[in-house]
Amino acid sequence: MRVLPATLLVGAASAAVPPLQQVLGRPEEGMSFSKPLHAFQEQLKTLSEDARKLWDEVANYFPDSMDHSPIFSLPKKHTRRPDSHWDHIVRGSDVQKIWVNNADGEKEREIDGKLEAYDLRVKKADPSALGIDPNVKQYTGYLDDNGNDKHLFYWFFESRNDPKNDPVVLWLNGGPGCSSLTGLFMELGPSSIDENIKPVYNDFSWNSNASVIFLDQPVNVGYSYSGSAVSDTVAAGKDVYALLSLFFKQFPEYAEQDFHIAGESYAGHYIPVFASEILAHKNRNINLKSVLIGNGLTDGLTQYGYYRPMGCGEGGYKAVLDEATCESMDNALPRCRSMIESCYNSESAWVCVPASIYCNNALIGPYQRTGQNVYDVRSKCEDESNLCYKGMGYVSEYLNKAEVREAVGAEVGGYDSCNFDINRNFLFHGDWMKPYHRLVPGLLEQIPVLIYAGDADYICNWLGNKAWTEALEWPGQKEYASAELEDLKIEQNEHTGKKIGQVKSHGNFTFMRLYGGGHMVPMDQPEASLEFFNRWLGGEWF
């Protein structure tokens, strides 16, 4: 969860950051980006004078350290298992051939979308071999994009309660470039991993009343692998649509249930795109009912204005930054906003990349240099090698065990919690600052949207998330923005009446502030997170 120096655990603004911050402090250890930048020189001649100046400034940040790393991720070492290993293989080319009669008696494809290049491999996992939720059905496998040599790993857990009727949820971590298996084992999955690298049962798992799919995406993240790369959110959305279409084709019993997409951090980019991709297909077997975004990065123009307030004592916790630093951030904000506005207007990497780098250095870098955890303003960064959390190291060690990789059918030679090359790819393609929040009004016309935020997070803080939801232009904006935050209390157990946060809602739009939660609310406040999750799936706010 460190900002990675460009990546966040669950990531979001972390990705481009650490390296950024390190560049300012120790240039020799800074981001090695000049290789792609040098390749841009001819293209720079075609840009406006202002744009050229921005790129010149970016290059000056890393004068000597830019030739050491490629911008594209290297392929992972892997060994593909034979088809005989898998219980089922769903061929997208076969699904593509299925035609049905519509209400008017006309022939049409049963499932829309370009699926012919995709296959889905499925294996029923043996929970007893892993010691993880042994009483629930589990499936693991890969989505294969055969035309582009891409292979996405997923892990499905059936609901502990009533799988024939409970909803299905897709969970996504962020980064970009961080594995969703981190969310599985550190936040909301059926087990966590302790210091002895052993699974520990989680009473507050989100599969208590829902079946959950954890997906390692984009490619080359976690157990996923590829000979090619994905470097923007829109491209990743095509893969997710294919996976869900083929998964629900194989398991029609789950396709009958309500389906929701949830995620955190950079999933604030992913989810508006992925949900829009699904809803764009008229004939689909994905029963999408809502989306949930936790501590997300969605509207940089609005959210970057709240780093100074959060770090300087205006977010409900004591100040981390001194007055001089706070003033410096105030002075940097107008230029940052101007650069993001230019990115929003052009959506060009030539404009969006400098905006990301300048704003992250100016508004996230000062906080990082304090040594405080960017994911939790209350604590120091305890383990820089694992994005501030020792638990992430435990998860990586567990998922790198040969017996675990064998049990889940993983095909890669090793597991990494975050792939920083992917992080850089997204950054240098301008994806970081693009205005994906503009897709949210279209979602609100069709499905409910929940934005929730742990109030101790810095990197994707609750102030910025509340602000962008109130600034969003949609038919219900006035009523939503004027709605007051109300107490959110536990209703479902012996702690009934306990205040766990605040909530405001109008129409299909809801915002929640969760008390005492950092960037990863389910990890910090497991009881509160399961409370609001179950009530949201039950339709309380929509």
From Swiss-Prot:
Glycans are attached at N209, N508. Residues 1-17 form the signal peptide. Gene3D superfamilies: 1.10.287.410, alpha/beta hydrolase (3.40.50.1820). PROSITE patterns: CARBOXYPEPT_SER_SER. Keywords: Carboxypeptidase, Disulfide bond, Glycoprotein, Hydrolase, Protease, Signal, Vacuole, Zymogen. Transmembrane segments: none annotated. It catalyses: Release of a C-terminal amino acid with broad specificity. It comes from the Eukaryota. The active site is at S265, D457, H519. Its EC number is 3.4.16.5. GO terms for cellular component: fungal-type vacuole. GO terms for biological process: proteolysis. Disulfide bonds join C178-C418, C312-C326, C336-C359, C343-C352, C381-C388. It is an enzyme of class 3 (hydrolase). It is found in: Vacuole. Residues 18-123 form a propeptide. InterPro entries: AB_hydrolase_fold, Peptidase_S10, Propeptide_carboxypepY, Ser_caboxypep_ser_AS. GO terms for molecular function: serine-type carboxypeptidase activity. Belongs to the peptidase S10 family. Vacuolar carboxypeptidase involved in degradation of small peptides. Digests preferentially peptides containing an aliphatic or hydrophobic residue in P1' position, as well as methionine, leucine or phenylalanine in P1 position of ester substrate. This is Carboxypeptidase Y homolog A. The gene is cpyA.
